[in-house]
A protein has these predicted regions:
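Catalytic core of soluble alpha/beta enzymes
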Residues: 401-547, 584-593
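Active-site loop/oxyanion-hole signature of alpha/beta-hydrolase fold enzymes
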Residues: 642-653, 673, 677-680, 684-739, ...
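Conserved alpha/beta-hydrolase catalytic His-Asp/Glu region
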Residues: 774-778, 790-852
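Conserved loop-alpha-helix segment in the C-terminal half of the alpha/beta-hydrolase fold
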Residues: 855-906
């Protein structure tokens, strides 16, 4: 059984770094070059343990032997061999003990044969104690029952460096049921995928399952009035007028189909409108012409893969609210193209008619979800209880109360008591503490409300590590919300911390967890573990509410399918946290989403059909729109700069019209074009100007004298810096900010240190102040002279192949747009000038700036990639040099003057590999300097 499972589900090959995709890590377990051996044995099971011991002696490596209990018992003499004093490394034997042979439990015979017959003739049942067998042979034995136990046992056995038998307790019936669920899940997934493909016409004629393109994207800033402040605010934050702001995304497909999405960050999370707009402007540029595959609506990592491969950005770098709005707009566009609703689109063929019937029976309606009302407990117990009684009379079956905002938990408990006295138990009560209580206060509240039948208490404690402790001490049902919002990386591994039965629900806000794909992943984990998946919103407009209604219904279908797989009764209908619609005094459309009492159930519900109809007929109320953005048009022009007996025709590209001027300098082989997405993203905050540096792209050098003068002139860092200073003075009378990458970063650093009267600050991306000693510079000069000769002798393409094969570019080579980036490196008109610029501006030719750093007068921001070990260390040393003053106020000022940021998931070419964090950092740097 174990071997068959490994053959079926294990992966024993190394994943290609070239095709790496940023999907959830649980989908791609990685085994690095593990050598696997096996012996069939007589009758399939004899002598396996002895063979493993011989293999360990022969290969002189540590061996892990995984074996079933029956095979183990057929070779117990191997334990005697194991105990012999033979020169070899320790062996770890993992015995899967299900007390018999289980293979027949997976065959049809198990369903048609009496259990007594199976036990007697097929299962080879035994009651042998493996622990006692090991004790008899003086072999260490460990018994484990869970995955965590196994991990600990493996760690201990490896630390102790001794032979060990690890017995893993298993159960034939549980194993058979697990395999049944896997088979049914695989069948369901295949059916769903086939359904998606069949729903799209002429898909067989389309390459790579791509059937449409994004023609363009635009966005609008909206502002709508609220009746009351969002419950995330404190009572004393209330102003005269309350508004909610956000963006409407509009995606146009190549067949004129349109999809709408909403991006509405909330103030209590790590996003703001300015940061969000930077990302929207970047994506607006990057998404134009992007292909969309037909499998995106499956959500199972497809969006993440598309963002990485098509847009070239790690999905984790996109703000959650932006990703949510982007997915919403694309799904709505695809649904419109297909002529279906969003819920039908993402459901595909996942749900059987039986699942839908079970759900209809549970909701007493054809397709709808129940709504949980939200109550901000600002008032006396009597006042709050009266509000709840009115909600119950209106048809709400569930209310959520905000607690932990009063002096004492007993005051909140008094409100719950009064509600039960006034309304009774005909309504479900949820309470939400928003992590505001200490463990002691949460326990105090819990002990006061034990008899009031709370459906759950949401985020009762301020420290995550106290959640399980609270569950066990209070015996109250708990729900997670902010804890889910803060999960990073491998979400499923993080969720495993919360399998405790006391955690009964996960509250999922798609705009906070990062869209529908992540929300589905979290919801499915909850449903598989028998927990409620409650969809909630963050005071968004009816556009988001309509999408969440359809998504919540999809999750209910998913839950029905899971209950069928697990042979579990379908629980009563879940009321989803979409009651924030009552806060909307205005909406972004003339008519909001219809949420009302259903005639079928007398409960407040949202109809999936109404939600679909709202999106289908969505019309923007222009009175709510503050401004519209389509796309920034770049200006392209040439400026001639003279210097002595030569001049340079600088090609410039420009975006934005603000008073702040930011000059962008590329690295060797780059051009001004590579800064286009960054400049467009920052065009609301700065006038961005990118430059083709001398010898690069379309910036030729012109000589006013003979060839001998040309040979004598060096395009050194100092010379280029002088040229750029003259260029900047021609462009603007004001000070500027420099942003430079690699070679451009060295030039920017030189100018920031030397021309502080004109340079207000500089962002140094993967830059260096040069080499400290002459010996190192001499070696580097020789290396770069050889490389320049290679460029002149064998041409640019050969040089590119050699240049980008180095270790410095390993991370860039893994980027899905690497080939596109390399093609952009061929756009240079004068190879001779390019080779001259390369050698003359070599770090071996440059004067060291290490000694000048401590005299720096302007703010500097150093940005490096997480995988760029060399430049991470250089940036750290530069910060130390700048701040190496003797205490006092000078030290404090130097610390503020120098910042360092390490960008995750990238190497040397930070701005190309992971651009969004770079854009955000540069934007904040611009804002910071504007305040000085």
């Amino acid at each position: 059984m174990v071997i068959r499972d490994l053959d079926m589900y294990g992966r024993g090959w190394r994943k290609s770094e070239k095709t790496k995709t940023h999907v959830m890590s649980y989908q791609d377990p990685c085994f690095h070059g593990i050598q696997v051996a096996g012996n069939r044995g007589a009758s399939g099971i004899d002598g396996l343990l002895s063979t493993a011991i011989g293999f360990a002696v022969g290969c002189n490596k540590q061996v892990f032997c995984m074996i079933g209990d029956v095979s183990f018992l057929h070779d117990t003499n191997g334990l005697a061999i194991l105990n012999q004093r033979v020169r070899r490394k320790p062996i770890i034997v993992i015995v899967i003990n299900n007390h018999g042979g289980a293979i027949f439990s997976l065959l049809p015979i198990s369903n048609t044969t009496h259990s007594d017959v199976l036990d007697k003739f097929f299962y080879t049942a035994h009651d042998v104690s493996i622990q006692k067998l090991c004790a008899a042979h003086s072999v260490k034995h460990l018994l484990v029952q869970t995955k965590a136990d196994l991990q600990i046992a493996l760690w201990k056995s490896q630390q102790e460096q001794t032979d060990c038998v690890i017995e893993v307790q298993s159960c034939i019936a549980d194993n058979a049921n697990f395999h049944r669920i896997i088979r049914m899940s695989a069948c369901q997934a295949a059916t769903q995928a086939l359904g998606f493909l069949l729903d799209f016409p002429d898909i067989e004629h389309v390459q790579c399952l791509s059937f449409t393109k994004i023609d363009k994207m635009e966005y609008m800033l909206y502002r709508i009035q609220l009746f009351a402040p969002p419950t995330s605010r404190q009572f004393d934050d209330v102003g005269n007028e309350l508004f909610r702001e956000g963006f409407i995304l509009i995606i146009h497909l190549d067949d004129n189909t349109v999809g709408f999405g909403e991006v509405a960050p909330i103030e209590s999370h790590e996003e703001n409108l300015s940061d969000v707009e930077e990302q929207l402007r970047f994506l607006l540029h990057r998404m134009k012409g992007s292909e969309i595959g037909s499998l995106l609506p499956m959500l199972n990592g497809c969006f993440s893969d598309w963002m990485w491969r098509s847009l070239g950005v790690p999905p984790s770098s996109i703000f959650p609210s932006v990703r949510c709005g982007l997915e919403m707009a694309i799904l709505n566009a695809l649904a419109a193209k297909q002529g279906s609703s969003l819920s039908d689109l993402i459901s595909g063929c996942m749900s059987s008619s039986g699942d839908k019937k079970s759900l209809r029976d549970n909701t007493q309606d054809s397709a709808s979800i129940q709504i949980c009302a939200l109550v901000d407990c600002n008032g006396t117990p009597n006042e709050v209880a009266y509000v709840v009684s009115q909600l119950a009379n209106e048809g709400f079956t569930t209310v959520k109360l905000k607690v932990a905002r009063r002096e004492s938990p007993t005051e909140d408990a008094a409100i719950i008591r009064k509600i039960r006295e006034m309304v009774g138990y005909k309504i479900n009560i949820r309470v939400d503490a928003n992590r505001k209580w200490t463990y002691e206060k949460a326990i105090q509240f819990g002990s006061s409300v034990k008899s009031f039948d709370l459906q759950y208490i949401e985020e009762p404690v301020c420290h995550q590590e106290d959640i399980i402790k609270f569950c066990e001490e209070s015996n109250l049902p708990v729900a997670l919300d902010e804890t889910i919002d803060k999960l990073k990386g491998d979400i499923l591994s993080e969720l495993q911390k919360f399998v405790h039965a006391g955690i009964v629900a996960l509250v999922i806000k798609p705009s906070i967890v990062g869209g529908f794909e992540n929300a589905r992943l979290i919801a499915k984990w909850a449903q598989l573990h028998g927990k409620m998946a409650v969809v909630s919103c963050a005071f968004e407009s009816s556009l988001s509410l309509s999408a969440y209604v359809q998504f919540a219904y999809y999750l209910e279908l998913q839950n029905a399918a899971i209950c069928t797989l697990k042979k579990r009764d379908l629980s009563r209908a879940i009321a989803h946290g979409l009651g924030t619609y009552r806060w909307l005094k205005e909406d972004i459309s003339d008519k909001g989403l219809k949420i009302c009492v259903s005639p079928c159930s007398d409960n407040v519900e949202a109809s999936v059909e109404d939600a679909h109809s709202f999106v289908q007929n969505f019309q923007i109320n222009n009175k709510r729109i503050q401004r519209v953005y389509t796309e920034e048009q770049l200006k392209s022009y040439v400026v001639k700069v003279k210097s002595g007996n030569f001049s340079c025709l600088f090609k410039l590209r420009e975006a934005g019209s603000c008073t702040n001027v930011v000059i962008f300098l590329h690295g060797f082989l780059g051009t001004s074009d590579e800064w286009t997405p960054t400049m467009k993203a920052l065009s609301h905050a700065a006038r961005g100007i990118s430059v083709d540096l001398p010898g690069h792209g379309d910036s030729p050098m012109q000589w006013h004298s003979n060839e001998e003068s040309e040979q004598k002139l060096k395009l050194s860092v100092e010379t280029v810096a002088d040229l750029l200073l003259k260029l900047i003075c021609d462009i603007t009378d004001e000070g500027v900010i420099l942003v430079g990458y690699s070679m451009g970063a060295r030039i920017a650093l030189h100018m920031a240190l030397r021309y502080s009267e004109k340079i207000e600050g500089a962002v140094i991306i993967s830059g260096s102040p040069g080499l400290r000693d002459e010996a190192s510079r001499r070696v580097r000069r020789a290396q770069d002279k050889s490389r320049a000769c290679l460029l002149l002798t064998h041409g640019l393409q050969c040089f590119l192949d050699t240049w980008y094969s180095g270790n410095l570019w390993r991370s860039l080579r893994e980027h899905p747009h690497f080939d596109r980036i390399i093609r952009s490196r061929t756009r240079h008109n004068d190879i001779k000038a390019l080779a001259k610029a390369f050698y003359d501006s070599s770090i071996g030719e440059q004067r060291s700036l290490w000694g000048d750093l401590k005299h720096c007068k302007r703010p500097l921001l150093f940005i490096v990639g997480e995988k760029d070990t060399k430049f991470k260390e250089i940036s750290l040393q530069m910060c130390r040099e700048i701040t190496s003053v003797s205490g006092g106020s000078d030290y404090s000022q130097k610390e503020e003057q120098c910042e360092r940021l390490v960008i995750p998931d990238c190497g040397h070419a930070v701005h190309l590999e992971n651009p969004l964090p770079v854009i955000n950092a540069v934007g904040k740097f611009i804002t910071k300097l504007a305040r000085i």
